[in-house]
């Protein structure tokens, strides 16, 4: 049984998808034991509390540099015996020490079909705005392992989502979450926990 930490920065809709999947018994080889937020007061912490999962806050601005932030985050993960880290809308960049401590054990969900609309600055509505501005007919989501390159780790799963006439970035974001992110992320986590993906 792998202990899973989910790192969040906002409302936690992907966290909720993971919690719901776990409650349905879809990941018998892993359990979410910790939710780490990058700032206090985010709704994701309420979701964690409602599910009986411990939540804590590790804020980048509380540390003088990224190395000390990474050390604090790593201490938090190690103290909770975390085996697998899932980035679910976590907006702080993980440093080399965290990535090195969890090789092929950090997953991220990205709201586009990597290698399109990814990399530094491509988060939130921006990938959807970029897909619409480019005139794309499809977009989607990607779950990948995290390495030192932003959105550059090995891809585990992808799912395409149609872009429809009249879509706004907000409408497209909601469709990508519902049709791709909330399905792919729990599936990828279960596959890693079962050893199907190593």
Please report, for each region that a protein language model flagged, where it lies by residue:
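N-terminal Rossmann-like dinucleotide-binding module
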Residues: 1-43
């Amino acid at each position: 049984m792998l202990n899973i930490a989910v790192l969040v920065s906002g409302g936690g809709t992907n966290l909720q998808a993971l919690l719901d999947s776990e409650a349905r018994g879809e990941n018998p080889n892993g359990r979410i034991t910790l939710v780490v937020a990058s700032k206090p007061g985010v709704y994701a912490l309420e979701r964690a509390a409602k599910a009986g999962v411990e939540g804590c806050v590790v804020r980048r601005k509380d540390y003088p540099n990224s190395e000390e932030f990474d050390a604090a985050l790593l201490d938090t993960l190690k103290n909770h015996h975390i085996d697998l880290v899932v980035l679910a809308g976590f907006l702080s960049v993980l440093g080399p020490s965290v990535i090195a401590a969890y090789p092929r054990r950090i997953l991220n969900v990205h709201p586009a079909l990597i290698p399109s609309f990814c990399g530094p600055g491509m988060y939130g509505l921006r990938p959807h705005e970029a897909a619409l501005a480019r005139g794309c007919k499809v977009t989607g989501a990607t779950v990948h392992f995290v390495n030192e390159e932003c959105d550059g780790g090995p891809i585990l799963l992808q799912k395409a989502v149609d872009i429809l006439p009249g879509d706004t970035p907000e409408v497209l974001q909601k469709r990508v979450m519902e049709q791709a992110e909330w399905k792919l992320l729990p599936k990828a986590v279960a596959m890693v926990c079962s050893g199907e993906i190593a």
